[in-house]
Amino acid sequence: MIYDWVFAVHEHVAFTAFDTETTGLKAEEDRIIEIGAVTFDRKGIIARFSTLIFPDRAIPPDVSKINHITDDMLVNKPRFCEIVSDFSRFIKGTVLVAHNANFDVEFLNAELSLCKKQPLSHKVVDTYAMAQAVFPGLGRHQYRLQNLALQFGLTVHAAHRAEDDARVCMELFTTMIAHHAKQNGHCVNHAQSPTIKKLIQEIQASSTDCSQELF
């Protein structure tokens, strides 16, 4: 399975489930307007992170209809470059978890580039792809975050808001970990292999370098 390494390390490292809300769908053109994240390990939640972000542009009306974030809500909010150091410290030493992760990672890297910072170097788990592997055979639309939440009895308080979507993503991830353990047994012994030990060390040392400028 594509994420066998996750099942091998999950009892030994921390994870950060995160989500972004944006002004549109193109990372090269649009901007992040909200980040929500929750760091957790096998014992439970460690910390939460949430902030609205001023994007230096108006939010298209069709986007506001989806995430219910308005221009007025972003007045006097920090720009991404003002929160990047805090967010980088928050995710340091963790595996990142996101639903349709390429979207969020592309936006974060685009914002990091605008701030003249290094791109993300963390291991990333895409719960969309993970769900397809753990629960094969569902209809294509059933792998959407809210549909998976409904199927597995996870509570959704505010769909398309970053903080709640991050929490739901975390709960979906832990549901899949538990399902895999029940079906296949825990993978604790695998963590003793040299390869997995090295991976654990790399994860725990992972960070986004916000002290070094790219150009």
Swiss-Prot record:
Co-factor binding comment: Binds 2 divalent metal cations. Magnesium or manganese.
Residues bound to a divalent metal cation 1: 19, 21, 165
Catalytic residues of the enzyme: 160
GO biological process: DNA replication proofreading
Quaternary structure annotation from Swiss-Prot or TrEMBL: DNA polymerase III contains a core (composed of alpha, epsilon and theta chains) that associates with a tau subunit. This core dimerizes to form the POLIII' complex. PolIII' associates with the gamma complex (composed of gamma, delta, delta', psi and chi chains) and with the beta chain to form the complete DNA polymerase III complex.
Cited function: DNA polymerase III is a complex, multichain enzyme responsible for most of the replicative synthesis in bacteria. The epsilon subunit contain the editing function and is a proofreading 3'-5' exonuclease.
Protein name as catalogued: DNA polymerase III subunit epsilon
Taxonomic source organism: Treponema pallidum (strain Nichols)
